[in-house]
Swiss-Prot record:
Annotated region (Disordered), positions in chain: 154-177
Quaternary structure note: Part of the 50S ribosomal subunit.
Protein name: Large ribosomal subunit protein uL6
HAMAP family in alphabetical order: Ribosomal_uL6_B
Any single Gene Ontology cellular-component annotation: cytosolic large ribosomal subunit
InterPro entries from the UniProt entry: Ribosomal_uL6-like, Ribosomal_uL6-like_a/b-dom_sf, Ribosomal_uL6_a/b-dom, Ribosomal_uL6_bac-type, Ribosomal_uL6_CS
BP GO terms, sorted: cytoplasmic translation
Provenance organism: Marinobacter nauticus (strain ATCC 700491 / DSM 11845 / VT8) (Marinobacter aquaeolei)
Keywords attached to this entry: Ribonucleoprotein, Ribosomal protein, RNA-binding, rRNA-binding
Record-level Gene Ontology MF annotations: rRNA binding; structural constituent of ribosome
Keyword field contains Ribonucleoprotein: yes
Length: 177
């Protein structure tokens, strides 16, 4: 059985948390996030520590307490240090260029791919084959990275495509005669 909810969330300096009933607001130097907590989960704030517990002993309540603790911990990390995901473009002529709230990608199609970045997410291109996506919401940063990767996922024969920087692509051998 997981005991994630038993670990308290320690609030770093500069992070402010407000509890209004089942609503939790987390504010930090990078921005603010809010989350609605399920009725089965109880949250207690003690100075700079948040504690999570299930209101009853039901299995689902305990699971929700652990999930809520993990989500709030991600919110606290996001508003204090932020989240980032790195993507690499591998392939001849594969390029990326960030222009404001748009990301222009050349991925071997007959047309350039233009990706509109959602509010709260920024992208920068340190080189024309690297994309760094940053934001305060971990789920949103991961979603944007997954959507960009989905345009041209890495293929197993040559390894061409858009991949996460830490991703290992399983390579296959070409068919032999």
């Amino acid at each position: 059985m997981s005991r994630v909810a038993n670990n308290p969330v320690v609030l770093p300096s500069g992070v402010e948390v407000k509890l209004n009933g089942q609503e939790i607001n987390v504010k930090g130097s990078k921005g603010a996030l809010q989350f609605t907590i399920h009725q089965a989960v109880e949250v207690k704030q003690e100075e700079n520590v948040l504690r999570f517990a299930a209101r009853d002993g039901a299995k689902q309540s305990r699971a929700l307490a652990g999930t809520t603790r993990a989500l709030v911990n991600n919110m606290v990390t996001g508003v204090s240090t932020g989240w980032e995901r790195k993507l690499q473009l591998t392939g001849v002529g594969y390029r990326a260029q960030a222009q404001g709230k748009k990301l222009n990608l050349t991925l071997g199609f007959s047309h350039p791919v233009e990706y509109e970045l959602p509010e709260g997410v920024t992208a920068e291109t340190p080189s024309n084959t690297e994309v760094v996506i940053r934001g305060i919401d971990k789920q949103q940063v991961g979603q944007v990275a997954a959507e960009i990767r989905a345009f041209r996922p890495p293929e197993p024969y040559k390894g061409k495509g858009v991949r996460y920087a830490d991703e290992q692509v399983r390579r296959k051998e070409a068919k032999k005669k």
